[in-house]
Amino acid sequence: MKFFLSIFLACGALGGHAQSSATIVKPVPAPGMLRLIQAYPQHLKGYTSNHIIWKDGTSMPYDDGLFKTEDETFDSTDLEDQMNGLVYTPGTRVDTPTFNCDPGTFRCQEFFRKMYGSSEAQAKSRLVPIVWPAKARGTTQRIWVTSVNGVNRHLQAVANELAARPHLRKHVTDIGGTFNWRNIMGTTRQSPHSFGMAIDINTTYAEYWKWDHRADWMIDSVEQNLRWRNSVPLEIVEIFERHGFIWGGKWYHYDTMHFEYRPELLPPPKKPVVKSTTRKSTPKKPSATASPRGGKR
């Protein structure tokens, strides 16, 4: 982590003598560090030159300073890797992902376990129900997601928007799942489903790269030549992203049913513009003696 130390000298007269003073400016934090603090205000309160500070007073390194291969980065992701390793691009313009570009899949396990729960029992204790659209028009079902970071509120907002768009119903009603304490298949890394902050929508109308290559997905040559596929309307993607969720359909190793709450990878929500209630005064007409420059041109 690089930071800059700025010093300036101010000279003035006091009792006829020149005085000097030096002011030390705080280290400039990495943009990713600030975005983490901005995205998770319930848990993070500040930073040092290379640490984020949690509200419980503990700190966590941002950049471990190590040069890693891609596999090493996946297995020992630090926060700097999480924020800068692969950039997630929001929006409904989706180009075919480049080889091995899976933005959002570098996850600092220590960070998420501290936030959402370090054990299955702890993560499960933070689950709450939300109302989600069901198969029959006008009906609903209950699904369980974490209350940490207000994920339940954000996902409820998604559900409300989806319910108001019946043409999207078949894609979202028969969900693939939310909370499931498990590792990602073939790895020792925990799935974001372990924390109740991810949802898989209807798998019938979605694609997953391993399902499309069931017989031969472990062959390197197949993985190097994946053909991106997607049946999920981008209207659904736009709704999820607006509420802080990223989409697995933007990965080279596509998982188009998958959404997870990752607000740190998305632009911060725009604050509503508050219109002034101050009554505007009527401008006075320029007097006959006013300068010509004060009138209309």
Annotate the PLM regions.
Residues 25-34, 38-251:
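Cell-envelope/glycan interface and biosynthesis
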